[in-house]
């Protein structure tokens, strides 16, 4: 019986590896076929922004459409959330980045439905 459980566990891991590998390969192949790749940089604070060179390189390339989404830091007080998002959003807009405001009608937007990014970089 022990031998059967061992075989089943091994089979389970082999199936999981196969599915992960093929799903990842499928997504990469699908992304490579796209003419325009939407890249979203999700940033919680302007001080953590370290992707300036990558953003500018993507902005210059005709195949990429980068944008920045300023996210509220949920670990801070609720009264400071909107103020920090506003100041960070204004900072990125002044620097000339394509920014998206995270609130619509007082609620956070659904990133997948509204922005439809192909690649998301999250910086905290």
Which residue stretches match the model-derived regions?
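Membrane-proximal basic amphipathic "stem/tether" segments
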Residues: 1-36
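Active-site and donor-binding regions of nucleotide-sugar-utilizing enzymes
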Residues: 40-124
């Amino acid at each position: 019986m022990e031998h059967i459980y061992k075989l089943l566990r091994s089979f389970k891991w082999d199936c999981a590896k196969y599915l992960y590998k093929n799903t990842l390969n499928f997504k990469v192949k699908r992304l490579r076929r796209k003419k325009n790749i939407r890249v979203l940089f999700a940033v919680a604070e302007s001080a953590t922004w370290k992707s300036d060179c990558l953003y500018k390189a993507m902005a210059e390339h005709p195949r990429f459409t980068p944008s920045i989404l300023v996210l509220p830091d949920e670990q801070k007080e609720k009264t400071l959330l909107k103020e920090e998002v506003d100041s960070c959003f204004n900072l990125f807009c002044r620097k000339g980045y394509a920014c998206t405001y995270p609130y619509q009608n007082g609620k956070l937007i659904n990133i997948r439905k509204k922005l439809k990014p192909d690649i998301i970089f999250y910086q905290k």
